[in-house]
Amino acid sequence: MPEREALAAAMQRWGFLEDPVPAAAWQWIDTFVEAYPDRTTEDARPLIAALRAEACIIPALELERLRSRDTLFFVDSVGQYVDQQPELRGLPLDRDLPEIAKEFGLSREDALLVTRLALTGEREGPALELLFPLLGHDRILIRIGAVNSRLLHGRGLQPLAFGPDGKPFEPIHGERPAGG
């Protein structure tokens, strides 16, 4: 686990942080240490660079999984949710994201996966409750906008016919309630 002072000094060396360290940066550093307790200070550099980037790379097949109306509108709703929050720390995302997803028929698991893929391009990582304040409002909204833009250009919401295994490919879809 990186110590906060050592991490702050390393971030200054890497050009990620000014000197003296602003009070808000200490909160960010504490959140980073909580999110990545198994990493060393030197391991932190690529993680911090990825968190500070305005975009992330979503592997092609994972992006294809997002290519449906349900996920597109869900991700847009997550952006609206974030935009309405004055503070991203302490959000009850484990409760709120599945609740937002219900409107689009997405399962809890799909809601959390879609959110993580849209924001990081990865299936695994720290808790979203820690990831949101690490990314911040602007980066979350920029990344969501980029995903939605990418999905709507080119083929639009027309998914791949077949996956790399030659079998029919299906993106993540919501399930409509019976009788609804």
Describe each model-derived feature in a short phrase.
Residues 1-180:
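Conserved nucleotide- and phosphate/pyrophosphate-binding catalytic cores
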